[in-house]
């Protein structure tokens, strides 16, 4: 008798899973209509169905939320690093301007052209160094963000999310961003439905 009850429970679970899959797939198909037509064409029924299957247990929603939080923290940290560098450069410029002004005020008039030429060279050298430091910082930021994207792609691929794999192809990246946006919108909808049920 217990075997029959267990079989009935399994059948009911499968039916609930199938219903949930259908709801997710239907919601995804509805959301896809909001995307540009070029991306709508690339999101086949199979891709959307596979995505809906990956979303069934809610784990992918949690993974995406975690990745989003990590990304925001990373972006904030990188922004703060660049801001610190800009502030250091601002202080360097102010200090050099002050030093030059004091030197000019204490300089004899006949030596002023020589001093100003030397100061101009010093200023140009400092500006060159500042540009190089800013470019190095920008390259570091781009590399860090690229690394973060690859980590996200790898994590979502390992989680079995359709359409995700490590790539640098701009079209594929845009498609993956659209898929993430679909997942995020679905998550927001389910949160709103959950709140409405309360």
Swiss-Prot record:
* Expressed in which tissues: Expressed in all the examined tissues with highest expression in testis.
Q: Which keywords belong to this entry?
A: Coiled coil
Mention any Pfam family matching this sequence. Answer: DGCR6
- Coiled coil start-end: 78-142
Q: InterPro entries, from UniProt?
A: Gonadal (IPR010849)
**Family in the record:** Belongs to the gonadal family.
Q: What role is this protein assigned?
A: May have a role in early embryogenesis.
What this protein is called in its record is Protein DGCR6
Q: What is the lineage of its organism?
A: Eukaryota, Metazoa, Chordata, Craniata, Vertebrata
Q: Which gene encodes it?
A: Dgcr6
